[in-house]
Amino acid sequence: MKLAFLYAGQGSQHAGMGQDLYETFPAFRAAFDEAAAAVDFDLKEVCFTDAAGVLKETQYTQPCMTAFAAGLTAVLREQGIMPDYAAGLSLGEYSALACAGVFDMQTAVALTAFRGKAMAATAAGRTCGMTAVLGLDETSLQACCSAAAEEGVVQICNYNCPGQLVIGGEKAAVDKAADLALAAGARRCLPLNVSGAFHTLLMHPAGDALREKFQSIHFAPMQFPVLFNCLGHEMAQNDTVATLLEKQVQSGVRWEATVRRLTELGVDTAIEIGPGRVLTGFVKKAVGNAISCYPVETAAQLQQLLCTMKGA
């Protein structure tokens, strides 16, 4: 068996996530509490109850998701379950790097909190958006974006799986590209409930802020390979983690390529770490049954996974 950990991104968060894991697994609780200490708000309250309704805001979503990942990773590590490879969708990449020992999970939470604030600040005051495009190939959608460029910035920002791409940019240009995509044969275009054009050139100021932040961070060597969003594969010898993370926030997430690369590397089993099962769905659509993917969000799912892994 070759195992990959896949860390979820923004969009699958919900109030109550991680609460039963926190109450059931001491290792989850300890790692979660340590991670929560890295931010300037009550992270546990936002994750478990979200009374103020802020969990959907990116500056809160990102560190909350990362703390959840820290807890689950700690339980798996305690049980002797560690991956051969790791990858994470968007903000999940920080958790993947922490799992690989590049920095600790508390640093990952602090960095994703900073990243969330930088992305929110970059998006503020701009009329931007993102739209999922279903049932159209990459080449055709790229042509639609090029034709809509007279309305403003628009580009493909997520390459999720076959038949599911996401475009982002200035709203008028995104709307125009979506109309052209429907005319070109797209099955549906679904506007996403997000506050900015993430993973597009419009996030350049956030990339600049991250580059400056990274100057104070020590990046240790990876204990195992991480596949990077902006590449769709492992880093090259002349790449640096800091440069790739800076690039990631302002360029497309190549998730389908990442999943296909995992199969080339011999991965046959994956654990989705995060609320929901979005990545499990993407894996299934990209490579079918070549990778058995186990989503883990609840204590019951984790107990079942531990039994499965011990029997493997």
Walk through the language-model features, giving the residues of each:
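FabD-like malonyl-/acyl-CoA
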Residues: 1-141, 192, 269-287, 291-303
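Alpha/beta catalytic cores of group-transfer enzymes, especially the acyltransferase/condensing modules
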Residues: 10-12, 37-39, 100-251
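Short, solvent-exposed amphipathic alpha-helical segments in soluble enzyme
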Residues: 22-23, 147-149, 182-184, 285-288, ...
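Non-catalytic positions within long, well-ordered alpha-helices that form the structural scaffold/packing
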Residues: 77, 182, 263-266
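NAD(P)-dependent dehydrogenase/reductase Rossmann-like domain
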Residues: 174, 213, 218, 266, ...
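A short, acidic, amphipathic alpha-helical segment used as a generic capping/interface helix at domain edges
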Residues: 250-267
